[in-house]
């Protein structure tokens, strides 16, 4: 049995459509949600269906085909199958529908669209960016729940994943040590892959956009035998694109395949592979400023590299899962994945000598590997006359990196070519012969852990979520951490059938290899996240909303031991370190996602974060921003509305990204990007039951801004001007 939710009108509550300061629009909308829900029919949650938006009684997490901007459940935080309202942490989900509506194709664009996350275009990393949340860099990305290690400063080894193979992206903000082990108290990003289907489905899309951007995508899934116990799926993409920045030209293609086999009615084996190749001509490291940090108002197309710069990357991934479902409702799952990127790049840099800018060129190659394993069992148990949930498991991951390279003979010397940013010719420098043996680095890290988590229903409205992890960490330099305990505690109280309040305490640790005056390694950095909030769930889960306040204390940070020897024993320069530094982050997050009416999808989020030094060896740092290049305020909004009547078959949408000012200052230069907002528009025409034509307009108002700023000579990445993408989707 199903019911249709009536089209309801929004109560005003003084929500006039006029310019409001940052969060006011989101707050106004959040205040309206209970009233919207009250106007809807009192249909049982297990039976509710909004027109075009499915809400399943089975609490399915899959978003493909749902038409929704939210999902039923997420287990990224605890591996317990909890709804967003039942999870005592801030969770956001970027669904397949929102990815398609916004025309998002890369992980960078996805992070830019998710509440609380900051994306800054990277330096020397191909076309990928660095990610942060709550004032700290993100250093954990998960694939189907299995963690992988990021590079320094939250840059994922130059990999900007193509989203065609993913169903959704789940993000848990704050300390996530229960599932990830080590890392920063920022967030964990879980990339959830598409799965095979038992019924046939196939689609094809072709896109053409600004700056000769061409893209083809094919996706097919079906049962492979009559009994439907063997199922498969294949996704293929090909893209060739230029850029608004001169010289830049990228070509990439990927192939993804996955097979599910029911070995028995209660046992399923999944195996898959993913291959992606990226060939980029040109590597942009941004534009320079004046020596004092003033922007030079260069054309947005300015490219200050050479025409022989390039970035070649190949990514190979294999993965497997074995799941067994017991008769008593428990399940056990064993999963493994191995990802092996290979990078070969040549890129240009700029150094400043007084008022003179000089050009340099570098090359390097890198071979990386990340192997992750996880085994866990989960199910329900009875205690004190109530049903509770439990998960227990163990995980292991190993990461290695071998890189080597060199630089042109003239680099950083007086013979280096002089660069005039106003009159630079990318072809004016001949390709140098670079000796790749000038430097080499290699590293191996391993970490293992055992974990457990439970949700205990102490009373009808009250649940307690408890967990803990014991971790072991080591690297090939001899540094190790043994039996590091990471606690997890949260409480959720249901105010009624739609609203809950919660509070949580979560932790994470981060190894640091610096040594003290006694030549002993410092103890790990600890990250503790305190959080409290309120969550709402409406229309049987078709709409989720949350508001949270948080405080993060990152302690034991290595700082200079000014009372110790200089140089530190065993080193040629610099003080020894002591684990006494502290950074404190405080803030507010608001998040709304899902269906407001049968035809109206919305995702809106506001974030305010203040992260500052509380203890440091340099007294001048106390009270200063931990990283002023991260904006304190962010507003993100995406909406889509399906028209009716004479305009039936049309869907229109818009998006807004706004952020506060950012700064970069080292004493000699001061860069500042003021607050800005960019607007996107999209419209889709359902030609017939199989074909849809969609137009996306990004930066519709053609705002001129710097997407990220870094220094006076590199890292100042200009935001893309207005651009369009036209896509034809066809379902076979």
Locate the predicted segments by residue.
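Gram-negative outer-membrane beta-barrel transporters
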Residues: 460-461, 578-666, 701, 729-731
């Amino acid at each position: 049995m199903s019911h249709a939710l009536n089209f309801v009108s929004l109560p005003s509550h003084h929500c006039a459509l006029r310019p409001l300061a940052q969060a006011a629009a989101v707050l106004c909308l959040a205040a309206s949600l209970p009233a919207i829900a009250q106007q809807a029919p009192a249909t049982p949650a297990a039976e509710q269906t909004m027109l075009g938006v499915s809400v399943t009684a089975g609490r399915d997490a899959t978003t493909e085909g749902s038409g929704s901007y939210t999902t039923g459940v997420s287990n990224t935080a605890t591996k317990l199958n909890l709804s967003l309202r039942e999870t005592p942490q801030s969770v956001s989900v970027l669904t397949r529908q929102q990815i398609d509506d916004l025309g998002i194709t890369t992980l960078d664009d996805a992070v830019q669209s998710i509440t609380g996350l900051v994306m800054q275009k990277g330096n020397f990393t191909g076309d990928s960016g660095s990610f942060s949340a709550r004032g700290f860099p993100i250093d954990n990305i998960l694939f189907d729940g299995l963690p992988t290690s990021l590079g320094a400063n939250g840059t994922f080894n130059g990999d900007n994943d193509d989203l065609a193979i993913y169903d959704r992206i789940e993000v848990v903000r704050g300390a996530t040590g229960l599932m990830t082990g080590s890392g920063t108290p920022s967030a964990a990003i879980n990339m959830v892959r598409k799965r095979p289907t038992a019924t046939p489905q196939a689609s094809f899309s072709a896109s053409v956009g600004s700056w000769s951007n061409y893209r083809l995508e094919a996706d097919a899934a079906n049962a492979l035998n009559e009994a439907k116990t063997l199922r498969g799926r294949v996704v293929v993409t090909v893209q060739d694109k230029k850029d608004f920045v001169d010289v830049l030209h990228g070509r990439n293609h990927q192939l993804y395949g996955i097979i599910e086999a029911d070995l028995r009615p209660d046992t399923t084996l999944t195996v898959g592979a993913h291959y992606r190749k990226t060939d980029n001509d040109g590597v942009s490291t941004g534009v320079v400023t004046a020596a004092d940090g003033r922007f030079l108002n260069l054309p947005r197309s300015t490219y200050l590299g050479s025409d022989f710069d390039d970035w070649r990357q190949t990514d190979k991934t294999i993965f497997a899962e074995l799941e067994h479902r017991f008769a008593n409702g428990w399940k056990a799952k064993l999963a493994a994945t191995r990802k092996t990127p290979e990078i070969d790049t040549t890129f240009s840099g700029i150094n400043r000598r007084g008022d003179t800018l000089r050009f340099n060129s570098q090359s390097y190659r890198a071979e990386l590997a990340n192997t992750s394993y996880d085994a866990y069992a989960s199910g329900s148990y009875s205690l004190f006359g109530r049903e509770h949930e439990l998960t227990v498991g163990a995980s292991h991951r190993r990461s290695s990196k071998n890189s080597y390279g060199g630089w042109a003979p003239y680099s950083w010397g007086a013979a280096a070519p002089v660069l005039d940013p106003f009159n630079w010719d990318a072809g004016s420098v001949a390709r140098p012969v670079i000796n790749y043996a000038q430097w080499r680095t290699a590293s191996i890290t391993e970490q293992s852990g055992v974990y457990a988590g439970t949700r205990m229903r102490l009373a009808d409205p009250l649940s307690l979520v408890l967990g803990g992890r014991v971790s072991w960490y080591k690297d090939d330099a001899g540094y190790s951490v043994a039996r590091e305990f990471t606690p997890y505690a949260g409480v959720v109280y249901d105010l009624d059938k739609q609203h809950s309040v919660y509070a949580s305490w979560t932790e994470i640790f981060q190894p640091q290899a610096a040594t003290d005056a006694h030549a002993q390694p410092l103890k790990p950095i600890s990250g503790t996240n305190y959080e409290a909030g309120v969550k709402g769930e409406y229309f049987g889960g078709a709409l989720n909303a949350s508001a949270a306040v948080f405080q993060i204390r990152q302690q034991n940070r290595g700082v200079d031991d000014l009372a110790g020897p200089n140089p530190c024993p065993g080193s040629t320069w610099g003080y020894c370190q002591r684990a006494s530094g502290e950074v404190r982050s405080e803030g507010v997050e608001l998040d709304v996602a899902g269906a407001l009416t049968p035809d109206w999808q919305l995702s809106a989020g506001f974030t305010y974060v203040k992260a500052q030094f509380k203890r440091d060896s340099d007294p001048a740092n106390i009270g200063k921003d931990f990283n002023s290049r991260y904006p304190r305020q962010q507003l993100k909004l995406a909406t889509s509305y399906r028209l009716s009547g004479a305009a039936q078959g049309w869907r229109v949408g818009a998006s807004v990204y706004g952020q506060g000012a950012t700064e970069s200052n080292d004493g000699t230069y001061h860069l500042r990007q003021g607050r800005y907002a960019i607007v996107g528009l999209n419209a889709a025409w359902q030609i017939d039951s199989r074909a849809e034509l969609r137009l996306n307009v990004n930066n519709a108002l053609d705002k001129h801004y710097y997407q990220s700023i870094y220094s006076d000579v590199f890292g100042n990445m200009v935001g893309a001007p207005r651009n369009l993408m036209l896509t034809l989707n066809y379902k076979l």
